[in-house]
Regions:
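Conserved HGGG/HGGXW glycine-rich cap/lid loop of the alpha/beta-hydrolase fold
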Residues: 30-79
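Flexible "cap/lid" subdomain of the alpha/beta-hydrolase fold that forms the substrate-access gate
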Residues: 2-20, 28-29, 68, 75-111, ...
Length: 199
């Protein structure tokens, strides 16, 4: 596995958010951390990064949590795993390994957005005693999502990119033109939002 460089964009002095590193589940993870207290593990979605949580982290810290937002495997500055494994089950194992490495206990909370939501569901299913609360946003549990695909054409339209990424063409398209595809997704999904801070 290799650590990939990233331009760290947060002004740590202004936010009380710091960048840390830990090795868990055979991968080196960089993560943002704010506050002390019970662990609140924040799993980002796609095309987001851990910086997505920068506005929520100080609020969680003020509520008595140690908010930790890892850059998920393959997202700079975390490592790119040599096995290329990004399945939900592996991401769930990452979350439980991070829980252990970061000193989590049975009062810990896990929050996942988008791609991070199935990972947090999986982590809770694999090790329910680790998590007091599980919060999934923007993506329902797998069975409900499957039913939505069967019953709701609009959901299939909104989820086109999930199917696109299953094809080898995605590797070519996503990296082309300095990742213009990712910028296009940001413009489409969040009109008017300046995503340069998050990329």
């Amino acid at each position: 596995m290799t650590l990939v460089p990233v331009k760290y964009l947060l002004d740590v002095a202004d936010t009380n958010i710091k960048l840390e590193c830990v090795s868990a589940n055979g991968t080196d993870f960089s993560y943002l951390e704010c506050g002390s207290g019970k662990l609140a593990l924040l799993l980002h979605g796609f095309p987001d990064t851990a910086q997505t949580w920068r506005h929520l982290m100080p609020q969680l810290a003020a509520a008595g949590y140690r908010a930790v937002a890892p850059f998920m495997r393959g997202y700079a500055p975390s490592a790119v795993p040599s096995d290329g494994c990004y399945q939900t089950a592996m991401l769930a194992r990452d979350a439980n390994a991070l829980h252990e490495k970061l000193g989590g206990d049975s009062e810990s909370v896990i929050i996942g957005h988008d791609w991070g939501a199935p990972s947090c569901y999986g982590a809770a299913i694999d090790a329910p005693s680790r998590w007091r609360q599980v919060v999934g946003m923007a993506v329902p549990p797998t069975a409900a999502l499957g039913m939505a695909f069967v019953q709701n054409l609009e959901q299939i339209k909104k989820s086109w990119y999930m199917f696109f990424f299953q094809h080898g063409l995605a590797d070519l398209v996503v990296g082309a033109n300095n990742h213009a595809f990712i910028e296009m997704l940001w413009r489409d999904w969040s009109p008017g939002y300046d995503a340069s801070f998050d990329l």
